[in-house]
């Protein structure tokens, strides 16, 4: 998967809707993951 940003408000590269942002970039979808679900990962 491709890390594109953060799911935490105020963090660097914050995205309010990880799945929608990933789709906008041409990925199949996305989800918040890693420690405490802080990162936005796009499905590759």
Swiss-Prot record:
SS bonds (residue pairs): 7-32, 18-40, 22-42
Biological process according to GO: antifungal humoral response; defense response; innate immune response; killing of cells of another organism
GO cellular component terms given for this protein: extracellular region
InterPro entries: Defensin_invertebrate/fungal (IPR001542), Scorpion_toxin-like_sf (IPR036574)
Main location, first listed in the record: secreted
UniProt keywords, alphabetically: Antimicrobial, Defensin, Disulfide bond, Fungicide, Immunity, Innate immunity, Secreted
Highest taxon in the source lineage: Eukaryota
PROSITE patterns documented for this protein: INVERT_DEFENSINS
Localization, UniProt: Secreted
Function, as annotated: Possesses potent anti-fungal activity.
Membership in a protein family: Belongs to the invertebrate defensin family. Type 2 subfamily.
Name listed for the protein in its UniProt record: Defensin ARD1
Species assigned in the record: Archaeoprepona demophon (One-spotted leafwing butterfly)
